[in-house]
Amino acid sequence: MINHKFDAETTPLYFYFALKRSYEIYAVYFLLLIICITGFGYPLHALPAAGWLIVCLLARYYINHTFIRWNLLFYVTISAGWICYFLYYYGWETGATSFILPLLLVSMFSLYDTLFNKIAFTVFLFIMRMALFFHCQTHPPVYVLTGIHILIIQILNTVVFFVVTSV
């Protein structure tokens, strides 16, 4: 247990480090994604990933300066926002839906949420995934990537998914 100076209660060390490591992993992910998208010849398309990288680094920095509950909310917002953005702009085939599972795990292992909140969050993630699925099935992505680009992004997303899930 760690006494987080901004919380009235103690924070389990594993939860604190899981959030901290997740931010670090996502920062590396966004950096690699910027390199990939720029390498594909679309440097302007990398700007949103650069924005998410900055937000992720700020959230990582402020993990020691804000309530752990707020950090959990930041993590969920960063992740859910990225999933929605990425699927909308690059399509279903890129594997971004995999990042829903770490969100579900963080919620389930959070000591700060009631059972009702955990169930409500699970329903929210389910609805979000289904809405994104139906959208991607009925609309083409904004940026159409080539087959090899989709493969590279799919591999990157799969590797990062397994790494972030393992923390």
Model-found features: residue ranges?
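Juxtamembrane or sensor-core-proximal signal-transducing alpha helices
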Residues: 156-167
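Membrane-interface helix termini and inter-helical loops of multi-pass transporters
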Residues: 137-146
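The cytoplasmic-loop to transmembrane-helix boundary for the fourth helix
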Residues: 111-133, 150
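Alpha-helical membrane-associated segments of multi-pass integral membrane proteins
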Residues: 106, 114-118, 157
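Short, Lys/Arg-rich, polar N-terminal cytosolic tail immediately upstream
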Residues: 1-14
